[in-house]
Amino acid sequence: MKEEIIIAGFGGQGVLSMGKILAYCAIMQDMEVTWMPSYGPEMRGGTANVSVILSDKKISSPIVTKYDTAIILNQQSLDKFESTVKPGGLLIYDPNGIINPPTRTDIKICKIDAINVAAQVGNAKVYNMAVMGAYLKIKPIVSFDNIDKGLAKCIPARYSDLIALNKQAIEEGMKAVEEL
C-alpha cells in the first residue's frame, strides 16, 4: 500500500499541520512516511501545500508529480493540483472560496463544508481537522486509535486540552463529507 497525498490551501488554514498530524498517525502504525512542505514567505494568506506519502514499504523518493489524493482548500490550489490527481484518485475540497468547482470525471470528488463543521464544534481553528475527518472517512488508512497519538505529538503540551476538540472536529468531518 502506498498513498501519495497533496494538501493545499492558504497559509493559516492548517495545511501543514494536517499533513504533519496525518504523518505522525501513520508513524504510530509503523508505516514509512515522508512530509514535504512548500510555502511562500507570508505567515498567513499566501499559498501553502504539503506532500505526504504513507507506505507500508520503503519510499524511494519524496518527489511526487501525480497524487492518489488531493485535499484542496482554495481556488488557486484547485487550479494548480486538480490535474495532478491520478485517474481513479480522490479530490476532496471545501466549497467555501471555490468559484469554479472541480470538473474531472475520471476521479472521485468529495466535498466537505469544513467552515460549517468548525462552527458546529465551536472553534474555527479546528477547520483543518474537519477536512482531515472527511479524508479519513473515505480512506481510513490510519486507525482512529492513532489519531490521539498523532494529535498529542503535534499539539504542544500547553494546549493538550484542545486534543479532544480536534478529535471531535475529525469525527464531525467524517459525518459531513459528501460524495459528488
PLM ranges: what are they?
Residues M1-L180:
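Active-site cofactor/cluster-binding pocket
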